[in-house]
Amino acid sequence: MELTLKDAKGALEVSEATFGREFNEALVHQVVVAYAAGARQGTKAQKTRSEVAGGGKKPWRQKGTGRARAGTIRSPIWRSGGATFAAKPQNHSQKVNKKMYRGAIKSILSELIRQERLIVVEKFGVDEPKTKQLAAKLKEMDLNDVLIVTKEVDENLFLASRNLHKVDVRDVQGIDPVSLIAFEKVLMTADAVKQLEEVLS
């Protein structure tokens, strides 16, 4: 199959297996959820009765006071005591094998092409790290909510994009399922498309 180049005459020959597959909604959902779960910190924590400071001394003797027996002032039923079932840091990550991950990326790319949300250009960049320069270029192309993907990290392009809302710049190694579906349009250079095809094959 061929992808039309927006900034030049001609087209780019790409693999049907990578850019022309059917959209697998269940797979994409599973991979996106797993990716988001892996980004969770899971640092919630509370203290049990053994972890709360103090409470080493028995508050009163075992027998003879008429009161209920007590061994520590940090018992969960006491004010300032530890939690009965204290929350602990958790690992929320889910296992996704490489085949599933690559399949989801291919599925998303194919759907972006069908929805005409993937734009391929021969080259894309700015001469200097100026936001105004990049903003003007994107306005020319009628793009304001876009993920820009290049073959390698372009320092000027990255710095120019940092102050633009809804614009992100990644290299091929930096893309993920969440970023691909988060933007209205995805702008890719021809070099990036070929490298991505190589990585996914």
Curated annotation (Swiss-Prot):
Q: Out of the domains of life, which is the source?
A: Bacteria
Q: Please give the Gene3D superfamilies that the UniProt record associates with this protein.
A: 3.40.1370.10
Tell me the function of this protein: One of the primary rRNA binding proteins, this protein initially binds near the 5'-end of the 23S rRNA. It is important during the early stages of 50S assembly. It makes multiple contacts with different domains of the 23S rRNA in the assembled 50S subunit and ribosome.
Stretches for region Disordered: 43-69
Biological process terms from the Gene Ontology for this record are: translation
Cross-referenced SUPFAM superfamilies, in alphabetical order?
A: Ribosomal protein L4 (SSF52166)
Q: Name one GO molecular function term.
A: rRNA binding
In which family does this protein belong, per the annotation?
Answer: Belongs to the universal ribosomal protein uL4 family.
Q: What is this protein called?
A: Large ribosomal subunit protein uL4
Which keywords accompany this UniProt record?
Ribonucleoprotein, Ribosomal protein, RNA-binding, rRNA-binding
Key word RNA-binding present in the record?
yes
Assembly, per entry: Part of the 50S ribosomal subunit.
Q: Cross-referenced NCBIfam families, in alphabetical order?
A: rplD_bact
Residues of the signal sequence?
A: none
Query: Single GO cellular component annotation?
Result: ribonucleoprotein complex
